[in-house]
Curated annotation (Swiss-Prot):
Gene: prfA
Gene3D superfamilies: 3.30.160.20, 3.30.70.1660, 6.10.140.1950
Name listed for the protein in its UniProt record: Peptide chain release factor 1
Sites of N5-methylglutamine modification: 233
Record field: compositional bias (Basic and acidic residues): 283-306
Database matches in InterPro entries: PCRF, Pep_chain_release_fac_I, Pep_chain_release_fac_I_sf, Prokaryotic/Mito_RF, RF-1
PTM remark: Methylated by PrmC. Methylation increases the termination efficiency of RF1.
One GO cellular component, as annotated: cytoplasm
PROSITE patterns: RF_PROK_I (PS00745)
């Protein structure tokens, strides 16, 4: 581990010199690339330097303890040695996590797809609740949300919605939301007060670069139609909405958010590329934990990653067995506590996997 950390520190120092070089600054594209590399290494280098400093302080204090004869001073030195030992142990754990292989998609923007599953109209209303939850979470994080396509019901539910989230670390945090979400509550339309169980499926896809996936124009069919609003009413008098069908796979993507047909086509192509990229990833390794195919399933009630229980004010994530009794704030975007716990569990599993090799 130390050999690798020394290499990273040397690389960081080399980059520090390069990004201050006027000849490199003149080439903005190259300079920005080097600045990005430099920023990515900064956290681990700072932690490593703190770790080395604590090691040196520990050795100095041990030396002082060996030479000290005063009882009170020896007790103080022993307390300091224990404190430094705790710091070193903590820094070692932090460095191990920072050295874990990074998901290449973590710094990308994302497409979020939410569909009502089992439960009919109530499932569509729950899909709308989840959409609001992620929209509020994005606002808290300072991310930007753009609707790509929406199929709404007459009473405000969402049969299906696709939206894009743009911002720092969007995929690294939202990727854990892929799966089937279950809600238990008394619907507004239920006169007997019976609790109903419904589901909605969430899929989180990273935005892909043009170099990541190439779409042959001969493999797609593009249809245009008039955009519709809530309940299906027409909201546009021109054929601005776009539907793209990828003929080899049968994947279909629609976009009607923009008034411009060209902009809708561009957005739909981005979603299509992300879906094709995800499909290629699934075929390359069917066991990848983040695959939507494995996580989302069919939307059946028996498949779930999280339950939202309204009568108890409870949200439970079944992957880590974590329960929070703050449903209202959770649905209002306060979801970091569970996401942080999922990230910690993911990191622990990766460390365990590396340690068993």
């Amino acid at each position: 581990m130390l050999e690798r950390l020394n290499f990273i520190e040397n690389k960081y120092e080399e980059l520090s010199i390069k990004i201050s070089d006027p000849t490199i600054i003149a080439d903005q594209k190259k300079w920005q690339k080097l600045c990005k590399e430099h920023a990515e290494l900064e956290e681990i280098v700072m932690k490593y330097r703190e770790y080395k400093e604590a090691l040196q302080d520990l050795e100095d204090n041990k030396e002082m303890l060996r030479e000290e004869t005063d009882k009170d001073m020896r007790e103080m030195e022993q307390e300091e040695i224990k404190r430094l030992g705790d710091i070193i142990e903590k820094r070692e754990d932090e460095l191990k996590i920072l050295l874990l292989p990074k998901d290449p998609n973590d710094d990308k923007n994302v497409f979020v797809e939410i569909r009502g599953g089992a439960g009919g109209e109530e499932a569509a209303l729950f899909a709308a609740n989840l959409t609001r939850m992620y929209t509020r979470y994005a606002e808290i994080k300072g991310w930007k949300v753009e609707t790509i396509s929406l199929s709404a019901t007459d009473i405000g539910g969402f049969k299906e919605i696709v939206f894009m989230v743009k911002g720092k670390d969007a995929y690294s945090r939202l990727k854990y939301e892929s799966g089937t979400h279950r809600v238990q509550r008394v619907p507004d339309t239920e006169s007997s007060g019976r609790i109903h169980t419904s589901t909605a499926t969430v899929a989180v896809l990273p935005e892909v670069d043009d170099v990541d996936i190439v779409v042959n124009q001969n493999d797609i069919r593009i249809d245009v139609f008039r955009a519709s609003g809530h309940g299906g009413q027409c909201v546009n008098t021109t054929d601005s909405a776009v539907r793209i069908t990828h003929l080899p796979t049968g994947l279909v993507v629609s976009c009607q958010d923009e008034k411009s047909q060209l902009k809708n086509k561009e957005k739909a192509m981005k979603v299509l590329k992300s879906r094709l990229y995800e499909k290629a990833q699934e075929e390359r390794n069917a066991s990848i934990a983040e695959d939507r195919k494995n996580q989302v399933g069919t939307g059946d009630r028996s498949e779930r990653i999280r339950t939202y229980n309204y009568p108890q004010g409870r949200v439970t994530d079944h992957r880590i067995g974590m329960t929070l009794y703050k449903l209202d704030s959770f649905l209002n975007g306060d979801i970091d506590e569970i996401i942080d716990a999922l990230i910690t569990e993911d990191q622990a599993q990766k460390m365990k996997s590396i340690g068993s090799r």
